[in-house]
Amino acid sequence: TPSFKAELGYTVSPYYWGYGYAVEASKAVLKYGFEELNLKRIECMCFPENSQSKRVCEKLLFPYEGVRRKGYQLYSGRISDLVSFAMTDDDYYKIKEEQLWEKK
């Protein structure tokens, strides 16, 4: 059976920070995930100190779910917390119906 959920991730070169590329690309991925793949949930996580990535999630109106304590191990071996956001298909269609992205 196909998966009902996916994880959204992105990397942007520092040369292009602040131009909104992560937000625009993520909107396209969310649209494809919910409208074409019929996903029920898309998750997005980042390190607590990554304020830019948290801001992308906020601009996309991802509901905040909390902190996954010691949720990730880096290549260096260091264990880090993860800030967790997730959007359901219900959230997405409400955003689309009410045109909330356009109002931001």
Tell me what each language-model feature is.
Residues T1-K104:
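Acyl-donor (CoA/ACP) binding surface of acyl/acetyltransferases
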